[in-house]
């Protein structure tokens, strides 16, 4: 429910019109309805968790919601900052995206009665998985097909978000070519996404980003070594593979 709320709010921020092959809430109604619906879902999720026998879930979800908002605010602040470093980008998506997955893993482990060591390992698993997911998602935003992916694409460029492929490109482009690239990034041309593809290919920016996504996926898988063999463990490993291989 919290995840759905963040997606509704994300679509407002990105001015997206399609999500999961359907019109977004803001496209079908308006931004006001979207903000209120997202807020309602957040509030309702906290109401549900507060009805549990202990306060662990409500504490964890409240803390994660705050961290996610911090990540979103930092991303907004970094728009148009084409000097953003890779470690800063990873820190932002660690809050914006990875925190929610880490929280889900913490909650699942806690309510399953797992030992603290396993809960901590699954927390790290969720974090690494979330970073891998976001990097792969940022690649899809640049190269994916909207009908296949099922959501609005190119919004990162539209909002001048400096994602990992772009950071890699900016780090590798020569000083004499950098002004041309920055002019292209600043343009309002609807075909900017296509115009940038040769740049990404020339400097292996997409392959680098995919490699980093796979690195974080491997880190996630390594955190599962404490878990005994089970269908649940198989599902977590399969989920990790899916995150970096998905095309939608």
Regions found by a protein language model. Give the residues of each.
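All-alpha prenyltransferase/terpene-synthase fold signal
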Residues: 1-248
